[in-house]
Amino acid sequence: MSIAKKRKGNFLKYFLTIISCIVIFTGIGFGTLAYMTPPPPKPPVFPQLPPVGAVSAVLMDGNTGDIIAQKEGELKIYPASTTKILTCIIALEEGREKLDADAVITPLAMGQDGTNIGLRSDMPISLHELLYGMMLVSGNDAAVSVAETVGGSYGGFIQMMNEKAVSIGATRSHFANPNGLTDKNHYTTAIDMAKISRYAMGNPAFRKIVREKVYPMRYRSGVYRNVENRNEFLSNGYRGANGIKTGMTMAAGECLVASAERDGQLLIAAVYDDENRWKDVEAWFDYGFACIRAWEKYEQEMAGEPAVYKFMNQLTGKESSWEEERKRHY
C-alpha cells in the first residue's frame, strides 16, 4: 500500500470518528444544549370583593395589621357593645392581679340599661368570671363592675380606655363608658375597632374568653350560670372562627367584630350598622382567605423551580431534558 493511500485511509478514519462524536453529543444531528429558565409566573388572580350592606366595614389581616378591604372604614360610628373588647383587654392587662378577687358591685353597675346579667351585691363573683358575663352575653352591668374594679373608679377606667386606644393606634376614637351605651362623646371607626381587636387577640387569655361557646359562670356561693356566646360563627361552626364580639343599639345598628384563623392566618372583620352582618362578614372572610391563598401560590411560583438544562434538537425542533438525551444515546 502506498503512503498516500495509507494517509488517506487514516484521515478518513479520524474524520468519521470525529463526526460520530459530534452526532452523539448533539443528539443525532445538530442539537444544542441550552440553559432554560422557567417563565415568570402570572400575577395572582384575586376574587371580586363581595358587596356588604354595612354603613362602615373593614377586613384586616390580623397577622400584619394590613387592610385587605374597607367600606367607609374611617367613618365616625357608635361602637355599641364592641366597646367591651377594649374594656376586657384592659381588665386582663391592668387588672391581672385582681382577677381572682371579688368584683366591685355598686348601684351604678346594677342600674345599667340594656342587656344585663343581673348582678347583685349579695351575690359576690370574681372579676375573672365577670369577664365571661361581659363578653359572651354582653352584660352592661358586668362592664361597669369590671371598670370600677380595675380602674379604682368609673372615671379612672374611662381615662385608661382612652389612653390605651391611643397607644394601640386607634386615634380617631373616644370612649365615654365601658359598655357602649349611646353617648355623643363615645365614638370610634371600623378601622380603629379592628386595630383594638387585633391587639386584644394577641392576648391568649382574651382569646380563650371570646372563643368559648358556653361557659359556666360561677358565683362565690358555688351557684353557676351557663352563659352562651352570641357569636353565631362559633355556634354554626364557621371554619376557623375564634372570636370576638357582637353589638347593637338603636343609634349604632347591628354591629359585629369577628375573627377567624386558618393555617396560622388570622382575619378580623368589623362591620357597623349592618342588618346582614353575619352573611356579609362570612362573605368577606371567604374573600380574604381566597386572596391569601392566591397570593401564597404566587409567592411559591415566584420562588420557582430551579432552572434546568434542556436539549433542543435542531432537526425535529423538539425539546427534551439532557438526562433524557443522555439515556437515549448512551
Label for each model-derived stretch:
Residues 12-15, 25, 61, 68, ...:
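Catalytic-site microenvironment of enzymes
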Residues 21, 152, 167, 290-294:
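A structural signal for alpha-helix termini and helix-coil/disorder junctions
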Residues 17-30:
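Hydrophobic membrane-insertion alpha-helices, especially the h-region
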Residues 170-171, 182-192, 197-330:
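Domain-terminus/edge residues, biased toward the C-terminal soluble/receptor-binding domains
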Residues 34-191, 195-204:
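Active-site-adjacent loops and short helices of periplasmic peptidoglycan-processing enzymes
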Residues 28-36, 288:
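Structural signature of transmembrane alpha-helix termini at the membrane-water interface
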Residues 1-14:
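N-terminal Lys/Arg-rich, disordered targeting/topogenic segments
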